[in-house]
Regions:
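Acidic, surface-exposed loops and disordered segments
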Residues: 1-333
Length: 333
């Protein structure tokens, strides 16, 4: 590689990194503390912290004073907006209600001072939590896993291969939605659920999307649908979370793929590893909101009967599973 080539690559890296910085700085919660979606993310984050505390083996009585006080205040501010998500408020109220009834010790002064505000929120939103916040029993099923269950899961996971030969049969909208519901159960930082997905059925719109991605030549246009997975930067509140959208989006995408696979639908993940100018082309084509970032595309459809897939052998497990020399060390020197 010549010096000029290195310089050009470095320039592209700097330009794209600056673009990422500007987008995260401008649209995350760092500078948009009163944005409705940022407030919603703050509520999700804090009431999940309350939930986590309630699941500990022996929660400290009236733990998390600062978090609880902040959560009640944020819920009040959010509830005064013209538009808000009642489910989020209902779940937060449910978590706070369980918190308030979880301890034998007498309530402290600070809790008594916010009880009136919580009572008002409970009166307005307690009926809105279709999926209650707080905690629940893990359930017997989690303790009844067997070697057979583990083997079935291993067989399922290992059966997945990227499909690049799709039949003409279209995937039903109800099935696509069911796979999204499954993917919604993916882990996300403090349950903030930043991932979004759009489906594009086979046709002009899907083809325009695929033309912007360089890994689908020869098969992309035959897919029943193309999924575009994105992440909402307004769900992230600190500089330390600047990469979290891609972590959560990757987990969501994998579970979306597995949800489709479980229903007989093949997939091929299409990376969106591009520089800022190419990303801008997609944004213009879709009029993508500036607070969303692209995670990946997924070509999907029913495999052709005679479809072939790659072997894609995996590297040795001992290159992936890193074991400490003495089994109990922090350093792998």
């Amino acid at each position: 590689m010549t010096g000029l080539e290195k310089l050009k690559k470095s320039k592209r890296l700097i330009q794209s990194s600056f673009s990422d910085l500007r987008r995260y700085s401008g649209w995350s919660g760092i500078r948009r503390g009163q944005d409705p979606e940022v407030l919603a993310a703050a509520i999700l984050k804090d009431f999940h912290r309350v939930e986590k505390g309630l699941t500990l083996p022996a929660p400290r009585a009236w733990f998390g004073k600062d978090v609880v006080e902040r959560l009640v205040g944020t819920c009040q501010a959010y509830s005064l907006l013209p538009h808000f998500d009642e489910r989020i408020l209902g779940s937060a109220v449910a978590a706070l209600t369980e918190y308030g009834s979880s301890f034998q010790d007498a309530p402290p002064v600070w809790w008594k001072q916010i009880e009136a505000n919580l009572a008002d929120l409970r009166l307005r939103f307690d009926s809105c939590n279709t999926e209650s916040g707080g905690s629940r029993e893990l359930g017997e099923l989690a303790h009844q896993r067997s070697p057979e269950t583990g083997q079935a899961f291993s067989d399922f996971i290992r059966s997945r291969s990227s499909v690049r030969n799709f039949s003409e049969r279209m995937v039903d909208d109800a099935l696509l939605e069911a796979a999204v519901v499954d993917a919604q159960h993916s882990p996300s930082v403090c349950n903030r659920q930043s991932s979004r997905v759009r489906y594009f059925a086979r046709g002009d719109a899907a083809n325009r999307l695929l033309q912007l991605q360089n890994g689908n030549r020869g098969f992309g246009s035959t897919a029943s649908h193309v999924a575009l997975v994105t992440g909402d930067l307004r769900s992230f509140l600190t500089s330390g979370e600047r990469n979290q959208v891609f972590i959560d989006g990757g987990l969501f995408s994998m579970n979306l793929v597995h949800g489709l696979l479980a229903r007989g639908v093949g997939t091929c993940c299409l990376n969106w590893s591009v520089d800022a100018p190419q990303d801008a082309k997609l944004r213009r084509a879709l009029n993508l909101p500036p607070h969303e970032v692209v995670i990946m595309m997924i070509a999907l459809g029913y495999p052709e009967i005679a479809a072939r897939v790659t072997h894609s052998p995996k590297i040795a497990t001992d290159r992936v599973l890193m074991k400490a020399p003495d089994g109990n060390a922090l350093s792998w020197t």
